[in-house]
Amino acid sequence: MEGEDVQALVIDNGSGMCKAGFAGDDAPRAVFPSIVGRPRHTGVMVGMGQKDSYVGDEAQSKRGILTLKYPIEHGIVTNWDDMEKIWHHTFYNELRVAPEEHPVLLTEAPLNPKANREKMTQIMFETFNTPAMYVAIQAVLSLYASGRTTGIVMDSGDGVSHTVPIYEGYALPHAILRLDLAGRDLTDYMMKILTERGYSFTTTAEREIVRDIKEKLAYVALDFEAEMQTAASSSALEKSYELPDGQVITIGNERFRCPEALFQPSFLGMESAGIHETTYNSIMKCDVDIRKDLYGNVVLSGGTTMFPGIADRMNKELTALAPSTMKIKIIAPPERKYSVWIGGSILASLSTFQQMWISKEEYDESGPSIVHRKCF
């Protein structure tokens, strides 16, 4: 790569939001919903120059006339045509760059299928003509962003949660655990418990309102049962929220009942272990000699770890599971909503990383499988 002065692009494609920007920046320039919308009825608005598809915020604002699709489900790309539209939108509309002029760092979910990494690589080189690219595991980037190379990352976004033990910069694939319980499920659960109180939230538009209620008012209780009793005996925990139409609703124990599902998935009718137990199970799958380093470096990452109280609760629950002498430390960086992107920004701007890029020449020589040799 001769372009020393060319800024690399960093794109973190999440199930719910896409975060994109320039390597070396401390925050993403563009954050928009990972959605593609297509008109439900064609040609109603004659002469309006109606597009055949909309991406991100524009799709969100026109959702009344569109069918919305999320091309990334549970962290894994399932619809490549729509994914290509999202990348196109990222380059040309959000960042306003020519992809053929910049190296591109993409992120992937832990345990992403091999065929998927190849497809990402192929699209970048063949559709967008990028000069160079790289694919990095999301949780590893979050760990880098926290200034560590060893630790266990509990990454929870909109579509999926993972616990990823990392030793000296390498994820340990045999010990990675996936939990299909994340932000979207918590929003759905909040809709359900608010409906039980007599408020009706059903449409996709109303779901966005509930997501906002969740993000602004929900928190994790340190002791769930005690908190339930406090909520029942006083109004100290009640908060009011004004809906877009001016109606004011009051929310009480829903504030902490909603995120409690992270620790007790049975609330959602799921039989899986909670995030604390999943973290513990991940650690127990690792070599006994590195467990101490993992317990002492539990890094929270992703938007669904933004609830107040989550770190203290995680500490309490892990302490109960771990050997009694073990020192446990939960790291919850304030910017953890974007720590995957930030880690990518750091990585792509390191001088030592510059030889790691897959160049167009290497791709033309070896084809998409080059990604398994160079990105691990």
UniProtKB/Swiss-Prot annotation:
Which reaction is this enzyme known to catalyze?
ATP + H2O = ADP + phosphate + H(+)
Q: Where in the cell is it found?
A: Cytoplasm, Cytoskeleton
Where would one find the signal peptide in this protein?
A: none
Which Gene3D superfamilies does this entry report, sorted A to Z?
3.30.420.40, Actin, Chain A, domain 4
Q: Function, please?
A: Actins are highly conserved proteins that are involved in various types of cell motility and are ubiquitously expressed in all eukaryotic cells. Multiple isoforms are involved in various cellular functions such as cytoskeleton structure, cell mobility, chromosome movement and muscle contraction.
State the family named in the UniProt similarity comment for this chain. Belongs to the actin family.
Protein name in the entry = Actin-10
Gene (name only): act10
